[in-house]
């Protein structure tokens, strides 16, 4: 059974300015905390489209949302398919979309999913259990150069080369099959002094592998750009991120659409084509409250950004 504490639950939904008869999309259903809070504000004409690529999360959410099932459409899919999902449902535009990015607590807490560096499990890390690529495949078969690239780019790991070398040396002897086996190898690649600083030594490599397995950053970029086109004027998009890579990407996309195209010189009136598509509701990201942190230590790195559609 999933037990998941939603981060910044009220803020994420309240910033959407919920209309009681509106249509909303939850792109990351997870433990359904945000979904339940939103559904409690909708009347019988309101509707929620709830997306998750993890079928276990959807099965659990049906129980959590059992009093609201007549207003929820569950979709087992990657949120990068937003446009197609709405097309299949014959919906043109919605009133708001929200994302709660990162791994949900239950995925971390179920050892056999392979996300956690605290429990021994096979190297899996797939959000969608039907996809083929796993962490095992990356760790054992990707080249040294590819490993260095993902550890550095997705994990911001400064010892990427040393760790990739240790992985290479170990897998030449025999395949690396479990999470704790990988943790020990990562520790070998990090100098003893550095291992004692900055949290768990495997944290950054595990984050990098998870992002690579699930193609998280490019999926999010695809999705958020579609979301901007699928929300009605005055509708809003809320995004909670959990690490700097996601937050930077979200900020850059919102900034780009807020600027609009460059206006040619000498135009007496600025045509609508050159006006911004959206405005950022909060210039600086909203962070978790002390109350959030008391409930859920994973909220410490959470940042919320909100944009409102202008045209």
UniProtKB/Swiss-Prot annotation:
InterPro entries: RsmH (IPR002903), SAM-dep_MeTrfase_MraW_recog (IPR023397), SAM-dependent_MTases_sf (IPR029063). It catalyses: cytidine(1402) in 16S rRNA + S-adenosyl-L-methionine = N(4)-methylcytidine(1402) in 16S rRNA + S-adenosyl-L-homocysteine + H(+). One of its GO terms (biological process) is rRNA base methylation. Pfam families: Methyltransf_5 (PF01795). It is found in: Cytoplasm. GO terms for molecular function: rRNA (cytosine-N4-)-methyltransferase activity. Its EC number is 2.1.1.199. S-adenosyl-L-methionine binds at residues 32-34, 52, 79, 100, 107. GO terms for cellular component: cytoplasm. Its main location: cytoplasm. Gene3D superfamilies: Putative methyltransferase TM0872, insert domain, Vaccinia Virus protein VP39. It comes from the Bacteria. Keywords: Cytoplasm, Methyltransferase, rRNA processing, S-adenosyl-L-methionine, Transferase. PANTHER family: 12S RRNA N4-METHYLCYTIDINE METHYLTRANSFERASE, S-ADENOSYL-METHYLTRANSFERASE MRAW. Belongs to the methyltransferase superfamily. RsmH family. Specifically methylates the N4 position of cytidine in position 1402 (C1402) of 16S rRNA. This is Ribosomal RNA small subunit methyltransferase H. It comes from Staphylococcus aureus (strain Newman).
